C-alpha cells in the first residue's frame, strides 16, 4: 500500500510525496525544491524519482535543484511538453512502476497541449486537469480536448482518490452553486469545506464519486447544468455545455 503526503507550496499548490514503508519516495509536480528538501530531511526519506504532469513553472520550478541534490533520480513527464530535465518522457498508455505498483499514464490535454495524469493503486495524480469541483483553464488546448480528458477521468472507478495540484475547492464550490443553486449535496459539502479551510485543513484528496456529485464540469449531461448555460450555447451538446461553463468560470 502506498502512502501519500502533501507538501504545501506557494499560496495554494500541493506537491505530492508518494512512499511505501521504507525510506524511499517519489514527488509529483515539485514547483519549488525547498519544501521538498525540508520534508525529506524531516522524515529521513530518499528521493528516487520525480513525476511531472505538465510544464508550468509552479509544477517544475523545483526540479533542477532536486536533480542537483539527487543526480541519479529519474524525472518522468509528458513527452509532448518542453521540459528539458526529463529522463523518461511518457505518453498516453505508458506505464510507470512505483514501489511495485504500476501507474498508467493518461493523456489529458486541455490545460496544456501535452498534459498527462498518473493512475495507480486507486490514486489519480491529475495536476491541473481536474480540481475538486472544478477544472483547469484552457491555456493551450481546446474545450473539446478538455471535455474528453475529463470524461476519461470520470470513467475511473468511483473509489479513485483524486490528488490534484491546487487547493481551489472553496472558490470552485461557489461557482458550482451558481450553476446548481438547488443541489443539496453541494450546499452541504460547501459548509464542510468552509469549516475545513477555516481550521487550516486540506480538502484534497477528493474522490471520483464525490466529484460526479459536485463538479459542474463532470455534470454536463445533467438537466440542471444544461439549463444554467442554456442562454450561453448554440446547441445543447455536452461539449457546448462544457465550453459555456468554462467561459463562465473564467469570468466568475
UniProtKB/Swiss-Prot annotation:
Keyword presence, Hydrolase: yes
Residues binding Zn(2+) 1, per UniProt: 54, 56, 111, 128
Entry keyword annotation includes Metal-binding: yes
EC number: 3.1.2.6
Reaction equation(s) it catalyzes: an S-(2-hydroxyacyl)glutathione + H2O = a 2-hydroxy carboxylate + glutathione + H(+)
CDD domains per record: hydroxyacylglutathione_hydrolase_MBL-fold (cd07723)
Keywords: Hydrolase, Metal-binding, Zinc
Pfam families, alphabetized: HAGH_C (PF16123), Lactamase_B (PF00753)
Enzyme class: hydrolase
Gene Ontology MF annotations: hydroxyacylglutathione hydrolase activity; metal ion binding
Residues of the signal peptide: none
InterPro entries referenced in this protein's UniProt entry, alphabetically: Clx_II_MBL, Glyoxalase_II_hydrolase, HAGH_C, Hydroxyacylglutathione_Hdrlase, Metallo-B-lactamas, RibonucZ/Hydroxyglut_hydro
Example of a GO biological process term: methylglyoxal catabolic process to D-lactate via S-lactoyl-glutathione
Family named by the database record: Belongs to the metallo-beta-lactamase superfamily. Glyoxalase II family.
Function: Thiolesterase that catalyzes the hydrolysis of S-D-lactoyl-glutathione to form glutathione and D-lactic acid.
NCBIfam families membership: GSH_gloB (TIGR03413)
Name of this protein: Hydroxyacylglutathione hydrolase
Gene designation: gloB
Amino acid at each position: 500500500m502506498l502512502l501519500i503526503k502533501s507538501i504545501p507550496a506557494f499560496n495554494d499548490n500541493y506537491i505530492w510525496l508518494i512512499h511505501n514503508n521504507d525510506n524511499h519516495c517519489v514527488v509529483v509536480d515539485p514547483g519549488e525544491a525547498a519544501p521538498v528538501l525540508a520534508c525529506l530531511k524531516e522524515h529521513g526519506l530518499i528521493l528516487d524519482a520525480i513525476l511531472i504532469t505538465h510544464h508550468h513553472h509552479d509544477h517544475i520550478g523545483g526540479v533542477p535543484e532536486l536533480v542537483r541534490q539527487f543526480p541519479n533520480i529519474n524525472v518522468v513527464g509528458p513527452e509532448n511538453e518542453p521540459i528539458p530535465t526529463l529522463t523518461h518522457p511518457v505518453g498516453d498508455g505508458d506505464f510507470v512502476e512505483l514501489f511495485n505498483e504500476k501507474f498508467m499514464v493518461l493523456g489529458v490535454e486541455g490545460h496544456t497541449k501535452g498534459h498527462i495524469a498518473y493512475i495507480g493503486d486507486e490514486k489519480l495524480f491529475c495536476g491541473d486537469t481536474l480540481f475538486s469541483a472544478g477544472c483547469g483553464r484552457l491555456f493551450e488546448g481546446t474545450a473539446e480536448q478538455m471535455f474528453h480528458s475529463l470524461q476519461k477521468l470520470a470513467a475511473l472507478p468511483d473509489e479513485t482518490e483524486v490528488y490534484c495540484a491546487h487547493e481551489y475547492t472553496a472558490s470552485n464550490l461557489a461557482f458550482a452553486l451558481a450553476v446548481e443553486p438547488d443541489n443539496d449535496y453541494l450546499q452541504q459539502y460547501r459548509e464542510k469545506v468552509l469549516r475545513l479551510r477555516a481550521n487550516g485543513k486540506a480538502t484534497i484528496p477528493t474522490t471520483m464519486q464525490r466529484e460526479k456529485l459536485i463538479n459542474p464540469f463532470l455534470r454536463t449531461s445533467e438537466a440542471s447544468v444544461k439549463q444554467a448555460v442554456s442562454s450561453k450555447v448554440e446547441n445543447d451538446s455536452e461539449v457546448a455545455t462544457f465550453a459555456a461553463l468554462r467561459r463562465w468560470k473564467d469570468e466568475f
